[in-house]
């Protein structure tokens, strides 16, 4: 049985958010790096750095906090396409999350991107997750 790295990323961030931790450590893969870059660009996390520990690489992400800096924002992440049930969409049928407030992360032929980027380029792909 294979590992679902996208579900691992989502679960790590969700657990750190629920436990009110400021940082989360995720095992490094190319998919993890691309998803974390999207979260950083969209403002769901503050900072990311690549960390090496005994020949293994990790991505250490700092979650975005509220203005009073006491606790992280509540970020909801939902895995859509999974290894047992793949969900694909063309660019015209990519769902809008909360009327465009949330984002959809897709895996396309041109890499991992958000729903807005996929609509602009006119390409569809596999819907990986929703974030709002």
Curated annotation (Swiss-Prot):
Family matches, as Pfam families: Ribosomal_S8 (PF00410)
A molecular function GO annotation: structural constituent of ribosome
Which coarse location class describes where this protein primarily resides? plastid
Q: Name one GO biological process term.
A: translation
Q: Is Ribonucleoprotein given among the entry's keywords?
A: yes
Q: Which residues form a coiled coil?
A: none
Print the organism lineage.
Eukaryota, Viridiplantae, Streptophyta, Embryophyta, Tracheophyta
Q: How does it assemble?
A: Part of the 30S ribosomal subunit.
InterPro entries recorded for this chain? Answer: Ribosomal_uS8, Ribosomal_uS8_CS, Ribosomal_uS8_sf
PANTHER family associated with the record: 40S RIBOSOMAL PROTEIN S15A
Q: Which gene codes for it?
A: rps8
Q: Which family does it belong to?
A: Belongs to the universal ribosomal protein uS8 family.
- Protein purpose: One of the primary rRNA binding proteins, it binds directly to 16S rRNA central domain where it helps coordinate assembly of the platform of the 30S subunit.
Which keywords describe this protein according to UniProt? Answer: Chloroplast, Plastid, Ribonucleoprotein, Ribosomal protein, RNA-binding, rRNA-binding
Please state where this protein is localized.
Answer: Plastid, Chloroplast
Q: What is this protein called?
A: Small ribosomal subunit protein uS8c
Work out whether the entry's keyword set contains Chloroplast.
yes
**One GO location term (cellular component):** ribosome
HAMAP family the record matches:
Ribosomal_uS8_B (MF_01302_B)
């Amino acid at each position: 049985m294979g590992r679902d790295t996208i579900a691992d990323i989502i679960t790590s961030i969700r657990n750190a958010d629920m436990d009110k931790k400021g940082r989360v450590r995720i095992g490094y893969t190319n998919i993890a790096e691309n998803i974390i870059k999207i979260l950083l660009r969209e403002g769901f996390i503050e900072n990311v750095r690549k960390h090496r520990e005994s020949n293994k690489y990790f991505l250490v992400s700092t979650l975005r906090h509220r203005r009073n800096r006491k606790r992280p924002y509540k970020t909801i992440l939902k895995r859509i396409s999974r290894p047992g049930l793949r969900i694909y969409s063309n660019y015209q049928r990519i769902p809008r999350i909360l009327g465009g407030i949330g984002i959809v992360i897709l895996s396309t032929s041109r890499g991992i991107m958000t729903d807005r980027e996929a609509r602009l380029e006119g390409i569809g792909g596999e819907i990986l997750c929703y974030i709002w």
